[in-house]
C-alpha cells in the first residue's frame, strides 16, 4: 500500500520484537497498547484504522472501538469467530478449548479473554451505536459477504469476521 498507493501507514504494536521487525521492514510503528495509547492521537487523524484479530484480547473492547472510531473516520476490524462449527464441536465433543488456525493457543496461554462470534459483533454494533458498512466472512480461504439472510451460516462456517465500521 505504501509503495503502490502512496499511503501513509503507522502502527501500534504491543510486542517489542514485532515492533523491531516492522521497523526493519521500513514501517512506522510505535510500541504501545491500543487500549491505552490511541488516546494520544487527535480526532480524525486517519482515514482508516485497522485492528487485526486483537479485539478479543483487550480488557475493554468497547473502549477500543470508541477510540478507533474517534481517531479514524472508518475502521477495519477482524475477529476470530468463536462461533465456527469446529470450535463448537471441539468444545462439545472433546470437552476442551479448541485450537484452530485462527485460534492457535492453549486455553492457559491465549491472549483471548473475550470469546466473540460474528453474530456477537453484529449485536455489539447495535449496542455500541456504530454502523457496519460492510461485513465479510473468511471460509476456507474464500471471502464472502455477510447479510441478515445468511448470518446464521456465516457464523457457523466463518473462521474470521471482517468488518468495515464507522460512527452512526
Where are the predicted features?
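Class I SAM-dependent methyltransferase SAM/SAH-binding core
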Residues: 1-37
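Structural signature of beta-strand start/N-cap positions in the alpha/beta core
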Residues: 8, 45-47
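Short conserved loop adjoining the S-adenosyl-L-methionine
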Residues: 37-43
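S-adenosyl-L-methionine-dependent methyltransferase catalytic module, highlighting the catalytic core
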Residues: 62-67, 74-167
